[in-house]
Amino acid sequence: MKSVQQFISNNFLPFLVVAFAAGILTGSLADLPLNVTFAFAILTGLVLPICYLKAADLSGYLTTILLFFIAGITAGTISSQEPNEPHHIYNLIDQQRDIVAVGRLLTMPSFDGTTSQAKINLQSIRIGTDLPHQPAIGTILLRIPAPWPQEYRPGTLLAIRAIMQRPAAYGVPGVFDYPAELARQNIWVTAFSRSTAQLHAIADTTTLLQNIRYIPEIMRNSVGEFLDDHTDHEIAGLYRAILLGDRSRLPDTTLEYFKASGTMHILAISGIHLTIIGALLFSLLYWLLRRSEWLLLHTNVKKVTGLICLPLLLGYTLLAGSNTPVIRACIMSMVFIFAFCNDRTRTLSSLIAFGALLILASSPQTLFTVSFQLSFAAFISIALIMPVIQPLIHNQLDKGPMTFRQVAASLRNWALSALFASTAAVLGTAPIVIYHFHRLPLAGPIANLVMEPLICLWALPFGFLALPFIGFVPTIATALLTIGSGGLHLAVSFAELIQMVPKTSLWLPRPAVFLVILYYCALSLMLLSQGLNIKLFRRHLSACLYILLLALLIFPVSPHLISNSKTAAVNFLDVGQGSATLIRFPDNTHMLIDGGGSAFSRETVGQRIIAPFLWDSGITKLETIVLTHPDGDHTNGVPFLLEHFSVQQLFISNYSSGNKQYEELIKMARRQGVKVNQAYSGDILQAGETSVICLANTGLEYGGGNNEGLVISLQRGNTRLLFPGDIDSNTEKGLIAMGKTLSSDILLAAHHGSSSSNSPEFLEQVAPQTIIVSAGRSRKTLFPSEQLREYCTIRQIPLLETSEKGSIRLELKEQTTEIAMLKDLQKNPLRRRHDTWQTTERITVRKE
């Protein structure tokens, strides 16, 4: 018992942080009433001081840890609440509205080449033309499809006409939760203006405090404009990333180079950036202060220098945008400087824990951000792994004059230390990287060994030194930036070289949470066994356990392989204005019917939605893809799937359609070794008890356009599903005239439910028990049409829209078809889960 108490005593602060973080997790996910939470808070406040006084024994330690867990529950519950102020924009906007708003530009706008984004701090809004302005508070994220006007700088009061709405998440398990990400930045409403003509500056008087508040962002904006004007596009984007924390102007290809090489963290201002900048400031200031004899005699010059660095680092944090990663890095830097000034630098675990506690106490929801998880996982893994490896790689150097052999040995030690530190960071962050990004950069240690010095020790110092000269001697600033750009060019070239090597970056399914926990437990056990006096067999056993769990992360077992379910499942994915339907057959093979959707971001719908869903489901292979017709909203996500899911065969309606993207897709499929087949009427695309048949290739009978497509029928027993693609009403009538068997239990509405399709005659022939519409949220009055809504209402046919329900899953059983939808899709984004399905309806199989 004494050994347990001693272990807790030596690591008391880390235990408190873990308990506090676990409490935040519990409070954020559990729907606890606020009165219970406040009772917990009062209890903690009363009992905690007593526990500190009695923390010398084990019961005192455990009670204190428990109270920190309760404090975490309180913090997690309160921080995950929706805004409750009546004038908050979140409570004024419950649906999409055309709004006139007055607000102040809060930060430097970003521009990715097509769209500008800006944070606006609201003062008032007007809903409709007949109502007066009413007070409004809160921050909105404004998007404009044009470059931001340079005359509107941070602090400018603007009148804005925009479409406002609460941000909507794609209802697809495994997909990035954008509304939750915004909510953690205290943004609960987004806005869209069609052009810069809908922005107008308002003359107003500001106080001195307001002017001071916006100075860092004004300076940041000016630095960004200088970088754009005095360096080329790619270099300006890189400098913006490492100096200002703005990655929006980086070309897509450059971003992919850094992602694939495992060096994306270098482009985010983090601990390593502030460490380099802090070391540079410390060296310059220390050299200057040592010129003073009085300071040398009366003070500890190193500690004075460290304290002077504090406000300078804080100022740079403000200049870099004060984003969460920058603030976190600044807090950690300040913690280490204070520890240095108090001679407490040897307690590394306590320093890391204290920094984490400060961050979580000030912003509990930071726990759920990827940057927080990766930063501390890397930091802790390096701190734990390197002491074990260090004795194995360091040669003892002889004292005296440095010989060539000693210099070589010193360089070898440094290179090996850097390589193993990078490897330790990769091992420590691997589960988190795979969980959030579905990829593991195997070349990360080598890439970091080369690229970190090029960017952090070459480009970053010269870029930082250029900052004070921008406003005074721009020629010197330009010269320094030019020197630093050499490191950036070399880093990009090396990253491009890494990407050209096959299999240096693996795309992997999302691991189960329990597997991630077991991985870290095994890693900790292996490291502890190396430092304790235990038998060699147990050391080897812990190492084997760790290697096994690492293998399970890279080569996971599909959940369907260990399932006894013999049912077929059909998933209608929420891809916006498009269509993508995944079919899982009882033998655990898969077919995707169409794979396209809304195309408004850098990533295609395949990378953004379909692939994450497949990985989240444990699927790494797609046996078949069927494309009903060449339109982009049915095909634009398929190229990514062809690259990463070992597709065996592709069924299409036509080889040539005049659509360049579609024809390039077919060429790409052939390069990948995919068997490309044109489907004809009556072709069996999948045989067995769950069969898929091509009822018609309408392009061969009715010409091009939306009618150039396949009509697909899925049958399991007496249950039928119909996928008509985007055919119009004339083609529907043609199918009826040809005597096609159209009767189906489930119908995926033609052309996303538009009025040009889904004729009453066609619907009468199909006689569906349920109609599903795959459409986006932006044009809900058109997709589905009023005629289809009315038809379903009169006949009491359930009309399920992916724009409202999210993804819709069907389980095709012998006697029934169960329809399930995601639970809590409309809840507070900080509390909802995107992986909980809830059965809402059962359809009895109709008898022949």
Regions found by a protein language model. Give the residues of each.
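Hydrophobic alpha-helical transmembrane segments in multi-pass membrane proteins
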Residues: N11, F15, G23, A55-D57, ...
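N-terminal leader/targeting segments
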Residues: M1-L92, Q96-D98, H200, T205, ...
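Aromatic-rich juxtamembrane segments at the membrane interface
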Residues: K2-N10, P14, V18, L106, ...
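Transmembrane helix-bundle signature of multi-pass membrane transporters/permeases
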Residues: S422, L449-P453, A750
